[in-house]
């Protein structure tokens, strides 16, 4: 926990929430338990989820690249933060002797290599720039369920759990939505201070506009993803239903805010 910063959104509470969603998926989905029978695979999943945003600075990759930060230079403008999270993860694990613990086991070196490969692949895939590529392969896996290796399952479970806020209770989902927009605003202020271009949605956004952004994210990213995952893992349908309910609540939320805006405008 000490290696997570006090960012509005990308903090230890986020990592813990993602880990809980992933653990819930593993516990409830029979097909997932079959695909991830090996203890090293399950251990890799839990370590990847809890570490996937470790030491996150509270801004996105675009900020790192635009500001030509040390991390952007180090990782050649490519999945900057995800590469950084991988690096910090293994620095911390090695510092605490996990590699030595592996070395004491039978075939420990091979197990460590497998663990490292699975965790790195999964964390790097949390870069949303890779989402369309992951979605395409997910649709292929629906047609051919044997396509995914155990390592692939770790990658897809982490990415799914990372997109899981709106499958939680409505009040919890709203709290996370509020946090991400606070983080956007914080980044926008830093960009202004550095004289960088600022995305309008990050600086000033009404509640109605925020609702429209979230509704679009649900329609074009979350629903297609979770519905596809539920085709592979039917036990996820309850979370898909919660997601659909959240979408309906956002529709009501938008109508109420638009109505208030109309009344306020008429009053002017």
Per-region residue spans from a language model:
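Peri-catalytic and regulatory segments of divalent metal-dependent proteins
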Residues: 11-15
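Divalent metal-dependent phosphate-bond-processing catalytic cores, especially two-metal-ion Mg2+/Mn2+ enzymes
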Residues: 9-10, 24-39, 47-268
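Short glycine/proline-rich turn/loop motifs
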Residues: 1-5
